[in-house]
Amino acid sequence: MTKEEAIEVDGVVKEALPNTTFRVQLQNGHEILAYLSGRMRKHYIRIVPGDSVKVALSPYDLSRGRIMFRER
């Protein structure tokens, strides 16, 4: 998934699952499974339920995404 292909949307983390996977509710009401990006893992950025995040979705599978940024 290259940067040009990814669809970026905003959402809110609803639930933390094992292996740095999260259930995220998007602004349009859909719920997806999202995993933490490698750069966020490397810098030990913590995500807790209730955080606002930016998610990159693949155009091929809109039910899974990658958390790219945590809003402050």
From Swiss-Prot:
Annotated keywords: Cytoplasm, Initiation factor, Protein biosynthesis, RNA-binding, rRNA-binding
InterPro entries: NA-bd_OB-fold, RNA-binding_domain_S1_IF1, S1_domain, TIF_IF1
Main localization category: cytoplasm
Domain S1-like: 1-72
One MF annotation (Gene Ontology) recorded for this entry: rRNA binding
Origin superkingdom: Bacteria
SUPFAM superfamilies: Nucleic acid-binding proteins (SSF50249)
One GO CC term on file: cytosol
Record Gene3D superfamilies: Nucleic acid-binding proteins (2.40.50.140)
Subcellular location: Cytoplasm
Quaternary structure and interacting proteins, as annotated: Component of the 30S ribosomal translation pre-initiation complex which assembles on the 30S ribosome in the order IF-2 and IF-3, IF-1 and N-formylmethionyl-tRNA(fMet); mRNA recruitment can occur at any time during PIC assembly.
NCBIfam families, per the entry: infA
Family of the protein in this entry: Belongs to the IF-1 family.
Role: One of the essential components for the initiation of protein synthesis. Stabilizes the binding of IF-2 and IF-3 on the 30S subunit to which N-formylmethionyl-tRNA(fMet) subsequently binds. Helps modulate mRNA selection, yielding the 30S pre-initiation complex (PIC). Upon addition of the 50S ribosomal subunit IF-1, IF-2 and IF-3 are released leaving the mature 70S translation initiation complex.
Protein name, per record: Translation initiation factor IF-1
Biological classification of the source: Bacteria, Pseudomonadati, Spirochaetota, Spirochaetia, Spirochaetales
